[in-house]
A protein has these predicted regions:
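Short beta->alpha transition motifs characteristic of CBS
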Residues: 90-95, 200-202, 217-225
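Short, small/polar residue-rich loop motifs at catalytic or cofactor-binding pockets
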Residues: 73-76, 200-204
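Bacterial N-terminal signal peptides
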Residues: 10-19
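Protease-domain processing segments flanking chymotrypsin-fold serine proteases, especially trypsin-like
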Residues: 21-88, 97-104, 112-115, 176-181, ...
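Terminal peptide-recognition signature
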Residues: 66, 79, 85, 89, ...
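Extracellular/periplasmic catalytic domains that process cell-envelope and extracellular macromolecules
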Residues: 57-61, 73, 81-82, 106-108, ...
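Bacterial N-terminal signal peptides that target proteins for export
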Residues: 1-10
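Chymotrypsin/trypsin-fold serine protease catalytic domain
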Residues: 126-199, 203, 224-247
Length: 251
């Protein structure tokens, strides 16, 4: 197990202030910004720091990536449409909270069933951070194409993320992210570095695409130690293709 263990994003906010620990991407957006000090000029149109390296999207852009919401419509995470009635998300987005709606293009689609991977947690530690959501009615957005069996990852391959970091639908700019590698300790995920931008609270369950627009990962976590954000992680979908096929065929 890695030294700086990555906890569930739903618990991460309580741990961020502790030194020498790693935290996951939490589902909820920041509550508010710090008010300016006396005599300080604050730009009304200034983007929040987590938008560095990203562009805002309107709800009708990239509609295959939607937000998740509880029954009252409160949003808290992201999901990716992979066929008209099935959505992939991070497992922790369905752990301790029940996703009720998948919101695509501003339209609400009721979630009929939630299936967590059977190895989501092993000995209380998140291992397979993935879940399949089944919609009651088909979503008209064009689904994301999944990677094929035998897909080869290579260090330096350009990546693009789409999610709801900070409660804002956003897409990483070209060149911001690239594939870094997979660790022995976490064989079900891959790493990309937060050098020119980072995934953020609310991106959980969002999409990671390669340079051909193929869905290769689901956003899982970020890691912080001693106050330094040093790592972004995504679920490796090549590891779970058989389970995804079985889950979508049975639900």
């Amino acid at each position: 197990m890695k030294r700086h263990a990555v906890h569930s994003l739903l618990l991460a906010l309580a741990l961020v202030l502790l030194q020498a620990c790693a935290v996951d991407v939490a589902a909820n957006a920041p509550k508010s910004a710090t008010p300016p000090k006396s005599g300080e000029i604050q730009s009304v149109n200034a983007e929040p720091p987590f938008m560095r390296g990203f562009s805002r999207l309107d709800e009708c852009s990239e509609p295959q990536v939607g937000s998740l919401a509880v029954e009252d419509g409160t949003t808290y995470g992201s999901g990716v449409l992979i066929d008209p009635t099935h959505v992939l998300t991070a497992g922790h987005c369905a752990d301790g909270v029940t996703p009720y709606w998948f919101i695509s293009g501003g339209e609400f689609f009721k979630i009929h069933a939630v299936l967590l991977h059977p190895n989501y947690k092993i000995a209380g530690v998140v291992f397979a951070d993935i879940a399949v959501l089944t919609l009651e009615a088909p979503c008209p957005a064009t689904p994301s194409p999944l990677l094929s069996r035998g897909y080869q990852f290579a260090r330096g391959d350009e990546l693009t993320t789409v999610g709801y970091g900070g409660g804002i639908k956003r897409k990483s700019n070209p060149g911001v992210f690239w594939y870094y590698g997979t660790t022995v300790e976490e064989p079900t995920s891959f790493k990309f570095l937060p050098l020119d931008g980072t995934i953020w609270f609310g991106d959980s369950g969002g999409a990671v695409y390669n340079d051909s627009g193929v869905l290769i990962g689901i956003i899982s976590s970020l890691s912080i130690t001693r106050g330094h954000l040093f790592e972004n992680s995504a679920v490796r979908l090549d590891v779970f293709l058989d389970w995804i096929q079985e889950a979508t065929e049975c639900n």
